[in-house]
Structure formats: structure tokens, C-alpha cells
Amino acid sequence: MIVPKISERFEHCRARQRCALIPFLTAGDPDLETTVAALKILDDHGADLIELGMPYSDPLADGPVIQAAATRALQRGTRLEAVLEMTTDLHQQLTAPLILFSYYNPIYHRGVSSFLKAVAQAGIKGLVIPDLPLEEAEPVLAETANLGLELTLLIAPTTSPERMRAIATASQGFIYLVSTTGVTGMRQEMASRVQELLHTLRQITPKPIGVGFGIASPEHARQVRDWGADAAIVGSAFVKRLAEPDQGLAAVAEFCQSLRTALDTP
């Protein structure tokens, strides 16, 4: 199976007027075998792309749910080599392109070129590096383009319009719009400022826009769709469900299907 690039998957969704669903999981929580099973379930229940978080000891952008998942995964010995070995074996069984979510420190220590080549060879199609500022992204962007990877950059509610334009121009695959200041995690309601930010970005760029941080329910997903998002990115709500010892995989399947149904309902 030939897995499409991230930008190609968004073109496919746009042609069908489909808001993409992008679930997030932490690799290795509770273990890599469960991660494999969960990725297959997400792929079977309506995920268009899937973010796979590389566990890190100091995840500054992540809230308590994903921080705890990263700690558990690291305690079980989850390392990059094992995660890439897993995706090498798995990616051709999935229709959803995989996006690796990784902080910059592990990339820097391995060496940018070495890291990116290993990721590309493992069948991963894109990267999100939440602590990589635009000013330092150019070397990574140049290498990802040569390897067939796409590096997606983040825009926050506090980003100025001028900086939004620069980030939107540089970002590959899609633009990751952070819905709120602060860390990842489930919110009671979506900030109405997201609608304004989406409108502003639409005037700047034709690139797809995914909204993440805080989407915790089918209603939230439908709301960002109605506000004009091209994708709903859902992390903590999936990670929390997968952490349930007895019903984790079943809960992930049910929740993914509920999000897909909400996004497909006019």
C-alpha cells in the first residue's frame, strides 16, 4: 500500500468536503504492542492522519495527561529506535499517514540529518516539533523537503499577523493552529477566539489548517469544523482513554467513531 503524503491526504479530504480527523497517541503507552493495536483501530475508525508522540522527559507543551503517558512510556523503556522499528513494520498496513510529534532536543542530540533520514525510512510522512521556532526551522525544512517528509509548524493565539504569514508560508503539509495558550489537554469548551484566528489565517494562506489543543468531544470537533478548520486534532482525550487498563482499546475505537460521525454530520 502506498501511503500518501500529508498534503495529498488533505487534498483528498478537501475534494470530498471532509474535515480531517487527526488523533494523537503517545508511542509506548502503555506499551508498543498496544500502540500498534490502537493505531490500527484509529485507521479503521475514521482517522485521516495520525500523530504519534515520541515520549520525552520534559514535554513543555503537554498537559498532565500526555505528560503522564510519556513518563509511563519512558519507564517501560520506549526509545526512538523501537518506535521507528514499529512504524517500519506497520505503516504500509495503514491508510492514514503518520506524523511524528517530537521535541527538538532528541533530534538535536541524534543529529538533524540522521534523525530525519531514520524517520523517513521508517515510513513516517511528517513531523511536528512544538519547541522549534521559525528562526531555527530552516535547516530542518530544507532536509525534510529532500526526504519526502513534511514539517508542520505551529501558530498560537498570541502569534502576530506578520509572524503568522511567515509561519504559514514555511509550514509544510498543513498549519497547526493551537487553540489556546498554555499546554495540551481537554477543555470544557473551545475558545471562540479560534474562529477569529481561522478567519485571519484564511486571508493569509490557502494551506490546510488543523486545530489542536483542547478538543475533547465530538461537539468540539464539529465546532472547529463549522468555524472552517480543515482538521480536528485530538490528543489528551485519546491518551486518557487508552490508559484505561481493561477497556482502553475499545474506548479508543468508540471515541474515534464518535468524532468521525460528528465531523461527517452536517
Swiss-Prot record:
It is an enzyme of class 4 (lyase). Keywords: Amino-acid biosynthesis, Aromatic amino acid biosynthesis, Lyase, Tryptophan biosynthesis. It catalyses: (1S,2R)-1-C-(indol-3-yl)glycerol 3-phosphate + L-serine = D-glyceraldehyde 3-phosphate + L-tryptophan + H2O. Its EC number is 4.2.1.20. It holds the Pfam family Trp_syntA. GO terms for molecular function: tryptophan synthase activity. InterPro entries: Aldolase_TIM, RibuloseP-bd_barrel, Trp_synthase_alpha_AS, Trp_synthase_suA. Pathway: Amino-acid biosynthesis; L-tryptophan biosynthesis; L-tryptophan from chorismate: step 5/5. SUPFAM superfamilies: Ribulose-phoshate binding barrel. One of its GO terms (cellular component) is cytosol. The active site is at E51, D62. Tetramer of two alpha and two beta chains. The alpha subunit is responsible for the aldol cleavage of indoleglycerol phosphate to indole and glyceraldehyde 3-phosphate. Belongs to the TrpA family. This is Tryptophan synthase alpha chain. It comes from Thermosynechococcus vestitus (strain NIES-2133 / IAM M-273 / BP-1). The gene is trpA.
